[in-house]
Every structure is written in C-alpha cells, then in structure tokens.
UniProtKB/Swiss-Prot annotation:
<feature type="transmembrane region" description="Helical; Name=1">
    <location>
        <begin position="38"/>
        <end position="61"/>
    </location>
</feature>
<dbReference type="InterPro" id="IPR000621">
    <property type="entry name" value="Melancort_rcpt_5"/>
</dbReference>
<feature type="transmembrane region" description="Helical; Name=7">
    <location>
        <begin position="274"/>
        <end position="297"/>
    </location>
</feature>
<comment type="similarity">
    <text>Belongs to the G-protein coupled receptor 1 family.</text>
</comment>
<feature type="glycosylation site" description="N-linked (GlcNAc...) asparagine">
    <location>
        <position position="28"/>
    </location>
</feature>
<dbReference type="InterPro" id="IPR017452">
    <property type="entry name" value="GPCR_Rhodpsn_7TM"/>
</dbReference>
<comment type="function">
    <text>Receptor for MSH (alpha, beta and gamma) and ACTH. The activity of this receptor is mediated by G proteins which activate adenylate cyclase. This receptor is a possible mediator of the immunomodulation properties of melanocortins.</text>
</comment>
<dbReference type="GO" id="GO:0005886">
    <property type="term" value="C:plasma membrane"/>
</dbReference>
<feature type="glycosylation site" description="N-linked (GlcNAc...) asparagine">
    <location>
        <position position="2"/>
    </location>
</feature>
<keyword id="KW-1003">Cell membrane</keyword>
<dbReference type="Pfam" id="PF00001">
    <property type="entry name" value="7tm_1"/>
</dbReference>
<dbReference type="InterPro" id="IPR000276">
    <property type="entry name" value="GPCR_Rhodpsn"/>
</dbReference>
<dbReference type="GO" id="GO:0007189">
    <property type="term" value="P:adenylate cyclase-activating G protein-coupled receptor signaling pathway"/>
</dbReference>
<dbReference type="GO" id="GO:0004977">
    <property type="term" value="F:melanocortin receptor activity"/>
</dbReference>
<feature type="topological domain" description="Extracellular">
    <location>
        <begin position="180"/>
        <end position="186"/>
    </location>
</feature>
<feature type="topological domain" description="Cytoplasmic">
    <location>
        <begin position="139"/>
        <end position="155"/>
    </location>
</feature>
<dbReference type="GO" id="GO:0005737">
    <property type="term" value="C:cytoplasm"/>
</dbReference>
C-alpha cells in the first residue's frame, strides 16, 4: 500500500507491491513495520471461491420460486456486491503480479487508470453491501411489526425499484470516486457513509429486538396470527444479525485504515497498522466467502436449491455428501 502524502483512493486500495509498479517511495513508515506480503494464490483462491459461491446464491434465487421474495432479492443484491469486491481484488492482484514480473509492459499513467477502475469497483461494492444490508433490515422490520400488511407494503415490484435505486446510487458513487480520486474528501465521504448506515442499522436492530417479544405476545392473541410466519420472520432477523456482524468485523479494519491514513499518516503506530493493509483486503474477501455459507446455514430452502443446482451439473459424489445434511 502506498502511504505517500498524495491521498488518493487508489493509494488506499492497492496492494503493498504496487509501490514497485509506480516507482514511488513509501514515506512516513517505520522500518520496523514492513508491509505484509500475501501470496497471489491466496487472493486468487478467495476470489474464485467467492465467485462460485455467490453465483450459486444468485442461481438459487433465480431457480427457486419460493425464494422470489423481497428479502431474497436483497440477498441477491448483496451477493452481487460480494462477488464484485472479491473479483476486483483478484483482478487487481493479477494485474500487479503481471506487471511486477514484466509479463506485460504498461505505461504508469495507464496503470493508474486501471487501478482507478478497480478502486471504483471496491467503492461500489462496499456501498452496495451497506445499502443491501439496510434494505434487508428494513424488510425484516416490516415483516415483524407489520406482518399482516407486509405483502401490501413490500411487493416484488417495490423491492425491484429499491434494488435499481441502490445500484444506480452505487454506480454514481463509483463514478464520483474516479473523477475526484485525488481529493481526501472522497475518502471522508466514504467513511461518513459507512458509519451513518451502520448507525441506522444498529439503531433499527436495537429497536426491533427490544419490541419484538412484546409484539409477538400481542399479535398472538389475534385470530389471524400465523406463528410459523412469525418464527420465520424472527429467523430472518437473526440471519441478518449474523450478516451484519460479519460485515462489521471484516470491513472495520479497512475503514480504520482509511481514518488513520487521513488523520495520522506520520505516526509510527498508525503506520504499523496500515502496513497490514493486504490482510484487511483478505478480510474483505473472506466476508464475501462467509456470507453464502450463512445463507446455506440459516435457510433450508437455500440449501436444498444449492444441492439441486450442484447435482444438476453432474457432481454426484458431492451430491451424496450433501445428502447427509
């Protein structure tokens, strides 16, 4: 990662080895804190696994009509975001590897343009992930507290419009990040967006779980009460809690890195923390790998559809193993 005073979004999201590509010196960094090098194979493996898993998730949602609900549409949006961030990191790693080993010769200016595209993809992904998680949280809130009117409030058409708005907003953010990549205010904007959405989601969760128990008791007295639906709604809320928890754990070091990059780039301790940037990229990719596992763990319908898709492509030994679960 580049720790130069030129605070570009590019510098914040490249691997440590990019300094050799651009021929820039790493300043303000303690000699005791060297950049952590991670094998290219690790990035490629995580990128490939994430790609396959999230394609499986999207395929399951498309294939199974029982998964054609607003919550799973938002899950599909989250899967696309996960796939995007993993693939952008993997592609960037391949590009850096090829240039470092002189397999391809590209002008520094063109390399920077390519990296701007990769960085934009990461920005689009994190904003899309946050927006999709927020949409799922709102969907679960409506399911629990407005159960009898849920299908009138959250229709498939409305969920489609919401997803379209999410990705239009995210792509617009990506374009802005490319245009103003030299400004540190772009980074401040991204950090502010992260904590603002995090605040809304956590507040919604606290409110949701504090009131859920009393609401369940009250609605249970209604003759139209559906206990199965209510349990499914709470299960969906717990699944979302797991997704949000993993998202915070995996993305927080990255955003802390951005904060330190702006606030204390010359501090030795900040420099030491920033020297592990490659590890923070790995954590982000791990988030993309873990999310589909959570879907499979929490949804029997999703597991069954995964099995059908895998078996449909002739992996009979894998199907035999899956059949045990």
């Amino acid at each position: 990662m580049n720790s130069s005073s030129h605070l570009t979004l590019l510098d914040l999201t490249l691997n440590a080895s990019e300094d050799n590509i651009l021929g820039q010196n790493v300043n303000n960094k303690s000699s005791a804190c060297e950049d952590m090098g991670i094998a290219v194979e690790v990035f490629l493996t995580l990128g490939l696994v994430s790609l396959l898993e999230n394609i499986l998730v999207i395929g399951a949602i498309v294939k199974n009509k029982n998964l054609h609900s607003p919550m799973y549409f938002f899950v599909g949006s989250l899967a696309v975001a996960d796939m995007l961030v993993s693939m952008s990191n993997a592609w960037e790693t391949i590009t850096i590897y090829l240039i470092n080993n002189k397999h391809v010769v590209i002008a520094d200016t063109f390399v920077r343009h390519i990296d701007n595209v990769f960085d934009s993809m990461i920005c689009i992904s994190v904003v899309a992930s946050m927006c999709s998680l927020l949409a799922i949280a709102v969907d679960r809130y409506i399911t629990i507290f407005y159960a009898l009117r849920y299908h009138h409030i959250m229709t498939a058409r409305r969920s489609g419009v919401i997803i379209a708005c999410i990705w239009t907003f995210c792509i617009s953010c990506g374009i802005v990040f490319i245009i103003y990549y030299e400004s540190k205010y772009v980074i401040v904007c991204l950090i502010s967006m992260f904590f603002t959405m995090l605040f809304f989601m956590v507040s919604l969760y606290i409110h949701m779980f504090l009131l859920a128990r009393n609401h369940v008791k009250r609605i249970a007295a209604s003759p139209r009460y559906n206990s199965v639906r209510q349990r499914a709604s709470m299960k969906g809320a717990i699944t979302l809690t797991m997704l949000l928890g993993i998202f915070i754990v995996c993305w927080s070091p990255f955003f802390l890195h951005l904060i330190l990059m702006i606030s204390c780039p010359q501090n030795v301790y900040c420099a030491c923390f920033m020297s592990y940037f490659n590890m923070y990229l790995i954590l982000i990719m791990c988030n993309s790998v873990i999310d589909p596992l959570i879907y499979a763990l929490r949804s029997q319908e999703m597991r069954r559809t995964f099995k059908e898709i895998i078996c449909c492509h002739g992996f009979r030994r894998t199907c035999t193993l899956l059949g045990r679960y």
